[in-house]
């Protein structure tokens, strides 16, 4: 999967199109990511020990990884990602600028 936790991404399709956010969690087996402030849904929480009040919460739901693009940190634009080997390590590289995305 080309998206990792902590990446800044742009949503390219769906109800939250053109929104940007940081990846909070990535689920490679399901090909889904949770993006901060994107795909917010209302969750009905029953009262329990942790939250005795309960109520309706707004939480981010996962979206499919094909609906987001990584934002290139050098120019701030959405870009495709390629994998290259640098110094014997597999790293992610921006296809627009050739900049290495991994820290």
Swiss-Prot record:
The record, for InterPro entries, names: KOW, Rib_uL2_dom2, Ribosomal_uL24, Ribosomal_uL24_CS, Ribosomal_uL24_KOW, Translation_prot_SH3-like_sf
Q: Name one GO molecular function term.
A: structural constituent of ribosome
Q: What's a Pfam family in this record?
A: ribosomal_L24
Q: Which PROSITE patterns match?
A: RIBOSOMAL_L24
Tree of life domain: Bacteria
* Entry keyword annotation includes rRNA-binding: yes
- Keywords, comma-separated and alphabetical: Ribonucleoprotein, Ribosomal protein, RNA-binding, rRNA-binding
- Assigned GO CC terms: ribonucleoprotein complex; ribosome
Q: Which GO terms describe its biological process?
A: translation
Query: What does the similarity note say?
Result: Belongs to the universal ribosomal protein uL24 family.
State its role: One of two assembly initiator proteins, it binds directly to the 5'-end of the 23S rRNA, where it nucleates assembly of the 50S subunit. One of the proteins that surrounds the polypeptide exit tunnel on the outside of the subunit.
Quaternary form? Part of the 50S ribosomal subunit.
What is this protein identified as? Large ribosomal subunit protein uL24
Q: Could you tell me which species this protein originates from?
A: Enterococcus faecalis (strain ATCC 700802 / V583)
């Amino acid at each position: 999967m080309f998206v990792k936790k902590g990446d800044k991404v742009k949503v390219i399709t769906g109800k939250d199109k053109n929104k940007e956010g940081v990846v909070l969690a990535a689920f490679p087996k399901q090909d889904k990511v949770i993006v901060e402030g994107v795909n917010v849904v209302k969750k009905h929480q029953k009262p329990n020990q942790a939250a005795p009040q309960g109520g309706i919460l707004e939480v981010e739901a996962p979206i499919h990884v094909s609906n987001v693009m990584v934002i290139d940190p050098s120019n701030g634009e959405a870009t495709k990602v390629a994998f290259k080997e640098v110094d014997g390590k597999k790293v992610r590289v921006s296809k627009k600028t050739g900049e290495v995305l991994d820290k």
